[in-house]
A protein has these predicted regions:
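N-terminal cysteine-rich, zinc-dependent DNA-binding domains of eukaryotic transcription factors
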Residues: 1-31, 71-72, 139
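Intrinsically disordered, low-complexity acidic/Ser/Thr-rich segments used as protein-protein interaction/activation
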Residues: 33-88, 92-101, 106-284, 302-315, ...
Length: 482
């Protein structure tokens, strides 16, 4: 019997051409992919096969996703955004732009900023497509919100924090508009994510809102004391802060989410001026969180040898925030007005710095003079290390904290470790110069030499910022170099 094989011109779509597979034939045009290669979700890579766009999408899956999940897995980044990018051009182009700027960020030194013409082209295209999509009545609500979220990341990577915050506020307004679809409101007016809503678009909106809240906490800790609009935006978008649930934490990411409200309660103006009963309620919430966290670690993460690097970093990060919050409560309860009250927590500050080193991977052996670059949009250690340097007078601990901030080039959401270290070092130098002698221990810095307040003012449209250090009498301004 003679078999006739019909020849069909291959359309060069990987891993198998549609002209072959659509008619039930096997495509012989390509060898099998290597088992070690990264496979993009079906539809994403094929759109830009063998192009710079495909390369950026692969960089996103290999590098950017890992960075964005350095502490906690995130279903929004890992699954939802990639799925939506298959069918939505503005999200696909935004992801390509983000990957391009991220790649540039990893290549450059601390004195340079990402400047990708390729990335900028796709960024501008994504903006135009997002505006066009949002003007259509039939457009699903999660698309412009996801676009805005990715745009915030791109602005952060370019060092344009003021622009990133403006975009963040715009995203909050969109979330507020779609609030009834995302969550339910209890009798106290607080908004809870509604677990009963199972629409894929609504679940994506819930995940996006959760990430916006994490970014909000970062911004709160950066400029909350000078940006009154931020306080309003937070309350309108995320409601009030909530009591903790009695049920145990199921994972480290859930413990992180519960921590956010406690951080916001303490952020400026925070607990200042609160009466004893309110401070007690807040202290109870912290103790409850600590109990739930300890139970989770004892149950699922007690064997240190079996922990992954991500889990070790996440636990250390949460321990840093735990001690930060506990110390803050003690200050509000017993030490308001005393700039030297922090001296009693010197040992705790040292322990926090050690945990910060674990969270940033500095506890692991590296070749000498090896510095890495990191980018993520989660809460990080730079804000806490800055507060330690501002509070602790001990010169050794201060320099140890600055060393961690300078060891790697980290963009932790809106917090840049290198710039935060510069601001913290300037604070330390101010206090030491005002002490009038060589500082060898905490007591060498007198109370009148202490910096009482630090305010950060972002320069509109620029990569620079102004820091104002307030003393008991007078203040001093300093421009942070870009």
């Amino acid at each position: 019997m003679l078999m006739v094989v019909r020849k069909v011109k291959c359309d060069e779509t990987r891993p198998a051409c549609k002209r072959c597979t659509s008619t039930g034939r096997k495509c012989d045009g390509y060898r099998d992919d290597s088992p070690n290669s990264v496979i993009l979700p079906a539809g994403v890579g094929s759109v830009y096969a063998r192009t710079p766009q495909a390369r950026s999408l692969q960089f996103f899956t290999e590098k950017t996703l890992a960075g964005l999940q350095i502490f906690f897995p995130d279903h929004l980044w890992n699954t939802k955004i990639l799925q939506i990018a298959q069918s939505t051009e503005c999200i696909r182009n935004a992801v390509i732009a983000l990957a391009s700027f991220h790649e540039q960020y990893l290549k450059l030194t601390s004195a340079q900023q990402p400047d990708s013409k390729f990335g900028l082209g796709h960024y501008n295209l994504a903006i135009r497509q997002s505006i066009s999509s949002s003007n259509q009545a039939s457009s699903p609500p999660h698309i412009p919100i996801l676009s805005c979220l990715i745009f915030v990341c791109i602005e952060v990577l370019q060092g344009k924090i003021e622009s990133a915050i403006a975009l963040f506020k715009y995203g909050c307004k969109m979330i507020e508009h779609h609030q009834p679809e995302i969550c339910s409101v209890n009798q106290f007016g607080n908004c809870y994510l509604n677990p009963q809503l199972h629409s894929d678009a609504i679940m994506t909106l819930q995940l996006a809102k959760a990430l916006f809240k994490r970014i909000a906490v970062q911004i709160y800790m950066l400029t909350g004391d000078v940006d009154t609009q931020l306080v309003i935006a937070f309350k309108n978008t995320f409601g009030g802060t909530y009591p903790l649930h009695e049920r145990p934490f199921r994972c480290l990411a859930e413990a992180r989410e519960a921590l956010l409200d406690i951080v916001v309660e303490q952020a400026s103006p925070g607990l200042k001026g609160q009466d004893a009963q309110q401070l007690m309620f807040h202290s109870v919430k912290i103790r409850q969180w600590c109990s739930l966290f300890d139970a989770l670690v004892a149950k699922d993460y007690s064997d240190e040898k079996s922990l992954s690097d991500v889990e070790r970093r996440a636990i250390a990060l949460l321990q840093v925030y735990r001690q930060y919050l506990e110390i803050n409560v003690a200050k509000y309860a017993y030490g308001q007005g005393d700039p030297c009250f922090w001296d009693r927590f010197t040992a705790e500050f040292d322990n926090m710095i050690n945990n910060a080193a674990i969270a940033t991977g500095l506890d692991q052996k590296r070749p000498e003079q090896t510095s890495k670059s990191f980018f993520h949009m989660d809460i990080g250690v730079s804000s806490i290390l800055f507060s330690i340097i501002a509070r602790c007078r001990d010169p050794t601990i201060r320099r140890k904290a600055i060393g961690i901030m300078l060891a790697d080039r980290s963009q932790e959401g809106v917090w840049n470790s290198q710039q935060a270290a510069q601001g913290a070092r300037k604070l330390m130098e101010l206090e030491e110069s005002r002490s009038g002698k060589e500082v060898k221990c905490s007591q060498d810095i007198p109370e009148e030499a202490r910096v009482r307040t630090v305010r950060l003012y972002l320069e509109s449209g620029k990569r620079t910022a102004k820091m104002v250090y307030g003393f008991d009498k007078g203040s001093w301004e300093w421009m942070i170099p870009s």
